[in-house]
């Protein structure tokens, strides 16, 4: 069984995907922008800005996630677009969270000021939604 778990930044995609993987014993596939940025030796936020202008980054990331998932009979794929890009998923889960909860989770993970995290999260949401519509014709605000 292939399980796809998606949600906006800070919704708990990684947390829930990890828990589902542990409970089921299925391998976790959670290859993200952070991983791709690390591979290329680029700061995460700089990499996000690059992706705003270069659709090939999203396309590569999503292609690699799907390839990893399709190599497994059973797996958990956690990513922002997993429920859309892994068409072969047997179960698709979309996580939602209020902006306040998401910002608090991101703040806990990344530190800095709460105000800064709020500003970055709003900006990231806008940019992600715009990119997903442009690249895939996906509206991640209406599930």
Features from the language model and the residues they span:
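Walker A (P-loop) ATP-phosphate-binding motif of ABC ATPase nucleotide-binding domains
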Residues: 2
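Hydrophobic anchor at the beta1->P-loop junction of P-loop NTPases
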Residues: 5
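P-loop (Walker A) phosphate-binding loop of NTP-binding proteins
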Residues: 8
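Conserved lysine of the Walker
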Residues: 13
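Hydrophobic positions on the alpha1 helix immediately C-terminal to the Walker A/P-loop
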Residues: 16
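ATP-dependent small-molecule kinase phosphotransfer cores
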Residues: 27-86, 99-100, 111-116, 126-128
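Short, well-ordered beta-strand core segments
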Residues: 75, 92-94, 143
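Small-molecule kinase domains that catalyze NTP-dependent phosphoryl transfer to phosphate-bearing small molecules
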Residues: 114-143
